[in-house]
A protein has these predicted regions:
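Structural recognition of the beta-strand scaffold that forms the well-ordered cores
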Residues: 91-95, 138-141, 186-187, 216-219, ...
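Basic, amphipathic N-terminal segments that precede the first structured/catalytic domain
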Residues: 12-82
């Protein structure tokens, strides 16, 4: 899931902050309950024909195509704004999060105007752009499962996610055939994109020569289970241990230091592949996730001060007041248009990994990072943005180390 943030700043006293947080939590809980109850599709998955499958030879089927203009080239305000390098050292195959919240379909059509608007104007500039220093970015559109698929572990929701994965796999195969040409690559993902990234890493990449070309996977925002790195499940990948680790999984799930996951209400599921080519959906609640602290790139539990945060970054909209927010989650565009990225907000939050495997942050200074918080103080929509500059630098670090290793 990914919601918009506008370029807003505020100065508040400690008392105002306290009451603002209490009010925010109440509004989040009530608003979330109202929002979620409206999302269930009116029919079951098998009762209607899915939207047409993508043709990945068509540029329009890509949110980011190597030969088409897009907003993955955005750089933070005040940073080097030169054009993307022509000689990129690696690629990133980026799988976007959920942007379809409707109840009309279990899987969004590829030409769904509002879902694509959210991807093109918020997700690509706000998330995929973190990789544009030295990486060529490709990002497919796919028949994503509607957001409701994660709210209940239903047969229809699982079927919708499996259909979405077939598109992601097809897009990856197209990328390999037409663009990769033996180059190293990253996997980048968030939320639903990470659900599919987990499966792609296990079923298509792990144990093959592709694993040797995988610099790292930034599989953020869907509780990548720690137990998938036990008993030989993954042959080629391990959880990241340092800033320069390669062929590894980098993951975190962000909460306010006053919040935390609500396992009792969480019905989202994770795919576990079986050795016979099949798999099983397993509820993720109470599973310890893989965890990396993006302010230190370690997986220990020491607190890391906000001074280590090199800059949180958010999308700046061309006309925030012109956005028709009442239409969010509907069928039509609501007037979103990304103008630029903000300047880095240095020292925005501190971060601490706790024993439960989740990342806990101090309350953000900038209002733009508090307008779309989810229940439990979940900063899911800011998993990338709060650590943007640290991520941007780290992608370059890992790539440089990988290329040095290959040159030996």
């Amino acid at each position: 899931m990914h919601l918009a943030t506008a370029h807003l700043m505020t100065t508040r006293t400690p008392i105002q902050k306290l009451f603002s947080r209490a009010g925010t939590k109440a509004r989040i809980a009530l608003g979330w309950l109202s929002f979620a109850t409206r999302l269930r599709p009116k029919t079951e998955f098998g009762d209607r024909t899915p939207p047409p499958a993508p043709d990945y030879s068509d540029r329009s089927q890509w949110a980011v195509h190597p030969e088409a203009p897009n907003k993955s080239d955005f750089k933070p305000l005040g940073r080097d704004a030169r054009d993307r390098p022509t000689a990129c050292g690696a690629d990133v195959f980026f799988i976007h999060p959920t942007s379809y919240f409707g109840a009309r379909y279990w899987n969004a059509p590829l030409d769904h105007a509002h879902a694509n608007e959210l991807v093109d104007e918020l997700i690509i500039p706000g998330q995929a752009s973190v990789f544009n220093d030295g990486c060529r970015i490709v990002a497919p559109r796919y028949r994503q499962a509607t957001f409701y698929s994660f709210l209940r572990g239903t047969k229809s929701g699982r079927a919708a996610l499996e259909l979405a994965y077939t598109d992601v796999l097809d897009a990856f195969e197209h990328y390999l055939r037409h663009w990769n040409q033996g180059r190293p690559f990253f996997i980048g993902s968030h939320s639903q994109g990470t659900v599919h990234a987990m499966r792609l890493l296990k079923e298509r990449i792990d144990g093959t020569d592709l694993a040797e070309r995988t610099v790292a996977a930034y599989a953020i925002g869907f509780r990548f289970p720690q137990d998938q790195f036990e008993n030989g499940y993954f042959k080629s990948f391990h959880p990241s241990r340092s800033a320069i680790d390669t062929r590894c999984i980098v993951a975190w799930d962000t909460y306010s230091d006053e919040g935390g996951p609500s396992h009792w209400i969480d019905r989202a599921e994770v795919w576990y592949a079986n050795s016979n080519g099949t798999g099983t959906w397993v509820r993720r609640a109470h599973k310890r996730p893989v965890a990396t602290n993006p302010l230190s790139w370690t997986n220990d539990t020491r607190a890391v001060a906000a001074s280590a945060n090199k800059g949180a970054v958010h999308v700046v909209l061309s006309d925030p007041r012109g956005v028709r927010w009442k239409g969010f989650g509907g069928e039509n565009p609501i007037g979103l248009r990304a103008h630029s990225l903000s300047a880095p907000h240095v020292g925005e939050v501190s971060a601490t990994l706790r024993e439960d495997g989740f990342l806990y942050v101090s309350w953000p200074i900038t209002k733009a990072f508090t307008t779309a918080i989810m229940p439990g103080g979940n900063f899911h929509n800011y998993d990338y943005g709060l650590f943007y500059m640290n991520m941007r630098e780290n992608v370059r670090q890992r790539l440089d180390v990988y290329l040095q290793q290959q040159a030996r």
